[in-house]
């Protein structure tokens, strides 16, 4: 897919890999919607990169917030062609550390953001992509890229929640790719 003139959504786009991707997309002529919760960094990045970028404060686990941000992206830029799911957190805690069990709420929060948040965004973006006309003669409508980690396969001490979340991302990507292939939407990690 040529990036020039395409629109990308980048979750976690205000820093790290997400920010690097935002910059690369803009350098190659794409328009970008940053979905993040860091208003300061996201807003400054959008301002720095100009009219080709918008920032939306989005909690990826919030269905209504994601849907509203997708609508705003379509209103600003038209069809959505790319979605990079970078939003995520880590929680370094042993299953039992210093005689106490890891708080279940910490485990759930990592799963909620890294796994369920990724699924929430990709399913709503896929719905939007499926409603769009194909961009080429092969029927391609878009691509969704999920961010996993070697921790999905080789987690270390204190990475149970993070490893489980990234293992879930790896595990769901292939069946989702098969689900969406007939709609012209590619899904990769």
PLM regions and their residue ranges:
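Active-site helix of classical SDR
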Residues: 122, 165, 173
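Conserved mid-core segment of classical short-chain dehydrogenase/reductases
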Residues: 90-108, 127, 131-138, 158-161
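Residue(s) in the substrate-gating loop at a strand-loop-helix junction
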Residues: 149
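Alpha-helical segment proximal to the catalytic Tyr-Lys
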Residues: 127, 178-179
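The beta1-alpha1 cofactor-binding region of Rossmann-like NAD(H)/NADP(H)-dependent oxidoreductases
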Residues: 39-40, 57-69, 104
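Catalytic Tyr-X3-Lys loop
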Residues: 81, 89, 100-120, 145, ...
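Canonical Rossmann dinucleotide-binding motif of NAD(H)/NADP(H)-dependent dehydrogenases/reductases
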Residues: 3-32
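Conserved Rossmann-fold SDR core element
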Residues: 25, 79-82, 170, 180-189
């Amino acid at each position: 897919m040529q990036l020039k003139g395409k629109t990308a959504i980048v979750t976690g786009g205000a820093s790290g890999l997400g920010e690097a991707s935002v910059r690369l997309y803009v350098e190659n002529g794409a328009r970008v919607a940053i979905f993040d919760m860091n208003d300061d960094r996201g807003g400054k990045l959008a301002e720095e990169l100009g009219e080709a970028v918008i920032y939306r404060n989005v909690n990826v686990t919030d269905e209504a917030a994601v849907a509203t941000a997708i609508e705003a992206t379509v209103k600003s830029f038209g069809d959505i062609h790319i979605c990079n799911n970078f939003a995520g957190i880590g929680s370094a805690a042993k299953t039992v550390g210093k005689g106490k069990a890891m708080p279940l709420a910490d485990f759930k929060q990592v799963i909620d953001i890294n796994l369920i948040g990724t699924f929430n965004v990709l399913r709503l973006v896929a719905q939007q992509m499926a409603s769009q006309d194909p961009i080429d003669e092969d029927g391609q409508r878009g691509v969704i890229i999920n961010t996993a980690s070697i921790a999905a396969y080789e987690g270390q001490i204190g990475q149970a929640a993070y490893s489980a979340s990234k293992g879930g991302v790896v595990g769901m990507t292939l069946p989702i790719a098969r689900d969406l292939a007939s709609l012209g939407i590619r899904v990769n990690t």
